[in-house]
């Protein structure tokens, strides 16, 4: 390509490298998901927050640079500034479980909404049991929270970690880590 590529909606980009007219390697297929949170500022205690709203979904490896984790998963929070008031139907937060690496979804996740980034109101939440959290395997799932067409500019996600992995876990006593990927707001 010769110019920057401008992406303004959901689409799939395919890239291939050629040398002397011959394809070198595999074609990279990159599905991009566009929603109200895509490319919006992420505020709060997150240094790599941009990957939460970059439109690129993480793989089944939490180390692929598309998953964001925190130093401590006891309680994490971040706020997405939609830059204008919006009608909000739902928030979807991508989570990964990698049992062998103690990567698990949170015990509790809440969504709070504000018009001014000062006064917030809780609009949705979900809690998960240990059986739902500490499932074996490696898989991705989206936690979807209904927002009932709330109006707001700032959307805050607050998650509480599951604590230590249980005695029956492959990593007993180790803190379960939260890994979030794409936050999608409709």
Where do the model's predicted regions map?
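Short, compositionally stereotyped local motifs that mark structural "simplifiers"
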Residues: 1-77, 96
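Solvent-exposed serine/threonine-rich low-complexity stretches and specific carbohydrate-binding patches
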Residues: 122-133
């Amino acid at each position: 390509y010769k110019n920057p590529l401008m992406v303004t909606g959901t689409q799939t980009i395919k890239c291939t490298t050629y040398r002397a007219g011959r394809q070198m390697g595999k074609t990279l297929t990159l599905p991009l998901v566009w929603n109200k949170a895509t490319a919006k500022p992420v505020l709060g205690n997150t240094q790599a927050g941009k990957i939460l709203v970059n439109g690129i979904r993480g793989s089944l490896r939490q180390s692929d640079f598309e998953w964001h984790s925190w130093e401590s998963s006891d309680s994490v929070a971040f706020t997405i500034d939609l830059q204008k008031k919006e009608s909000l139907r739902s928030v979807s937060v991508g989570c990964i479980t990698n049992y062998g690496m103690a990567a698990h979804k949170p015990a509790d996740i809440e969504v709070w909404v504000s018009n001014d980034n000062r006064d917030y109101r809780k609009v949705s939440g979900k809690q998960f049991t240990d059986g739902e959290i500490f499932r074996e395997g490696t898989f991705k799932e989206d936690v979807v929270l209904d927002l009932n067409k709330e109006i707001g500019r700032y959307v805050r996600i607050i998650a509480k970690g599951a604590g230590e992995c249980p005695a029956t876990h492959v990593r007993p006593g180790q803190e379960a880590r939260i890994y979030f990927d794409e936050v999608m707001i409709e």
